[in-house]
Amino acid sequence: MADKKRYEELINILDQYSYDYYVIDNPTVEDAEYDQKMQELLKIEEAHPEWVTPESPSKRVGGEVLEGFKKVAHDTPMLSLANAFNHEDLADFDRRIRDKVGDDIAYMCELKIDGLAVSLQYENGKYKQGATRGDGTIGEDITANLRTIRSIPMKLQKDYSIEVRGEAFMPKRSFQKLNEIREEEGQMLFANPRNAAAGSLRQLDTKIAASRNLDIFLYAVADFGEMGVETHSAGLDMLETLGLKVNKERRLCSSLEEVYAYIDEWTEKRADLAYDIDGIVLKLNNLEQQRQMGTTVKSPRWSIAYKFPAEEVPTKLLDIELNVGRTGVITPTAVLEPVRVAGTTVSRASLHNEDLITEKDIRIGDTVLIKKAGDIIPEVIKSITEERSGSEEPFHMPKKCPTCDSELVRLEEEVALRCINPKCPAQIKEGLIHFVSRNAMNIDGLGEKVIIQLFSQHLIKDVADLFFLSKEKLLELERMGEKSVTNLLASIEASKQNSLEKLLFGLGIRHVGAKAAKSLAVHFETMDNLKVADKETLTSINDIGEKMADSIVTYFANEEVHDLLEELKRAGVNMTYTGPKLEDMSEEELVFAGKTVVLTGKLEKLTRNDAKALIESLGGNVSGSVSKKTDVVVAGSDAGSKLAKAEELAIPIWSEEDLIEYLPDEGGLNE
């Protein structure tokens, strides 16, 4: 008869074997012994399924088939990093740091792993949830697939409740083996290890993810300060003591010269690593100095990513095609003989505009040098003129739009040629793709391929038509089944409730980006107010300059725009700003003004997003972790370690009912 004590002993033994092998790269037993212990564990679990926990080593082999990936909100945003491409960029970064916090600084330099950013949540030392970065605010729940990565411990060495960030990746050797198998089976090959890792973590069948031999390096906690450390380097050391895998090739540098030396070293040695890196990350080491530097909307001001110089590769320029963007700009695109650049196969590259082609004397048939700008976007650097045979053809931009045959114009102070026909099909199609994108109306399931199908089959001619699509028509599209169509229609319906700034950005008004759209929405509150605004009123608003104001006035003077807005209203699309408007609230109403608030536990009446929105509307900033800098903790039922820490630090604790008292009288956020 199986002994539960022996079962628990086996779990601890197998966890230690995995730690030795996958985390510190120091195997202590032969594979046969590991396999024997695992088989013993599996037999016990078969006899006693009631003993099995999510932390069992048996859960790493996969087997669970998922229905899909739920959305996960990051309590602390997973910000991206600003890039540096040369010593001058790094010197500017260093100067900004010193101007703010003084000269007593040090930088932790780490290898920038070319993988997929993920977040791991541990509760009382046990692995609870894993998620992708997503857009930094909302990611996808990939808990089950991350569990298959052997270097991720299911239990920490201490019972901490923390959120850890890191980079999941596929080692070069695993990538090579995977592509060899796919080639034998006649499947499409992965372009690079990063794509392979991302694809593996989005498998619905966890057995597939388990077979891909992924790995991970952890590089941060959502809030290192709550761990009682004062520096980033001490935080990384702490992660190692918890049993988490941290890259050992890090170095603390006290000067830019030391940073440059570290960069030069790894620029030379990067090819020798067992995994891909695409740069070096610098982080201000002192956590208090990090706090002083703060963050922008997108990235921390205390960290920067140095990107390695782009690889330059020669290939043949076969042709030049013209693309029409949503604002009518005509962009020439190089059609290339396929070639591998920075880990992916490139067959097309931007040529930007006619002036650049003329200036660089780029001709069809040339051998050209291409690179990836920032290792992402392919571009043509120059023609290799000494390889010309005389058969190459100079390129001349047409005088008419390649899509609608309208006359092309060059507007004052612009380099690009532009089609100004508002009914140009290419512009309408690109505008539709923009309208449904993540930063605009964010309609899940309406990707570029679906938009192109809808447009080519004349099911939509403008953005308003999206809101009148029927289930019957959608089911006629390729690869659109009952479930996909139901989900898509639900997503379209949900998007009608978006706040005004989302709609404004989605409409694609020239020069109006996401930030300006938010400023306009906050100031005017309704579309009706905005569309009658004059230039003087517009330019009085932060972020709105003369050129943008002219563009907005011109846009709303168009009768076709009025008709479009009426159609959107008829469809039930919200045309008011529904976000917080702090400047109109009194000090008494702004109960959380300038305060940091932490939500913990299960809320009964408010969703977590509603609670967060309410706190922000009252002037507060919502954080994911409790520290000495926390001003208030709002605790629901089953609140755990965060509540205990708040009590220990004597931080004021609110109940959900306390928070609900501040809901607006007209019904508030939870209706």
Curated annotation (Swiss-Prot):
Active site: K112 (n6-amp-lysine intermediate)
Pfam families linked to this entry: BRCT, DNA_ligase_aden, DNA_ligase_OB, DNA_ligase_ZBD, HHH_2, HHH_5
Binding residue positions for Zn(2+): C401, C404, C419, C424
Keywords: DNA damage, DNA repair, DNA replication, Ligase, Magnesium, Manganese, Metal-binding, NAD, Zinc
A GO BP annotation: DNA repair
InterPro entries for the chain: BRCT_dom, BRCT_dom_sf, DisA/LigA_HHH, DNA_ligase, DNA_ligase_CS, DNAligase_adenylation, DNAligase_N, Hlx-hairpin-Hlx_DNA-bd_motif
Cofactor: Mg(2+); Mn(2+)
Origin superkingdom: Bacteria
Protein name as it appears in the record: DNA ligase
Originating species: Listeria monocytogenes serovar 1/2a (strain ATCC BAA-679 / EGD-e)
Gene (UniProt): ligA
